[in-house]
């Protein structure tokens, strides 16, 4: 099997093929690039999933449940007006390339300029990327992806956590510091107010990310 299996990530066996047939999940282990992704992804016969890549290793994970999907949608609606005022554009999941053999598909992103149909977005064009944390993505969203985004020079990383069983919503906005690591720029829980002037003005209660 060629996929990297992080905590809770779907373990995907290579599809059965005739002996000797080329199997990208096997043959391309550790050497994935955007060019190869364009050629071989999505894998025929697999359910719809996210394909991300860390140092050439393909990472396959399920799409988010309704809680995170709604939270990401609300973040898009909250950020779109102030971001557009600066000439930026807000997007749901897209391919953000962080290196020759690295890419992520964040739950939402703010680009410095319109993507205009591009399939692969250079990390240099991303002002902010955001992830909604789920049990299957906790390690990646808290450790791996922030580290890769910081290394790529993306100035802001936003982490969103929601739970209906706990009536909990939390937003952490990280900003790239002088030493190349992310530092907490703004943070708030449901019932409080997240307020920031950078990268664009935002002021709202994280509880808005929970459905009524």
Summary of predicted features, one role per range:
Residues 1-212:
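Gly/Pro/Ser/Thr-rich low-complexity, intrinsically disordered segments predominantly at protein N-termini
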């Amino acid at each position: 099997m060629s996929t990297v299996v992080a905590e809770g990530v779907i373990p995907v066996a290579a599809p059965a093929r005739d002996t000797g047939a080329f199997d990208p999940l096997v043959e391309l282990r550790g050497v994935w690039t955007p060019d190869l992704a364009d050629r071989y992804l999505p894998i025929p016969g697999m359910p719809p999933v996210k394909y991300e890549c860390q140092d050439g290793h393909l990472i396959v994970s399920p799409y988010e449940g309704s809680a995170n999907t709604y939270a990401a949608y609300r973040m898009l609606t909250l950020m779109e007006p102030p971001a557009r005022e600066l000439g930026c554009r807000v997007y749901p999941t897209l391919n953000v390339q962080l290196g020759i053999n690295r890419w992520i598909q964040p739950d939402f992103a703010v680009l410095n300029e319109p993507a205009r149909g591009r399939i692969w977005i250079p990390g240099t064009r991303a002002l902010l990327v955001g992830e909604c944390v789920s049990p299957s993505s906790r390690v990646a969203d808290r450790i791996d992806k922030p580290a890769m985004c910081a290394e790529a020079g993306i100035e802001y990383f936003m982490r969103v956590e929601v739970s209906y069983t706990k009536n909990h919503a939390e937003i952490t906005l990280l900003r790239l510091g002088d030493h190349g690591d992310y530092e907490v720029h703004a943070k708030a829980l449901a019932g409080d107010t997240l307020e920031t002037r950078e990268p664009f003005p935002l002021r709202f209660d994280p509880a808005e990310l929970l459905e009524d």
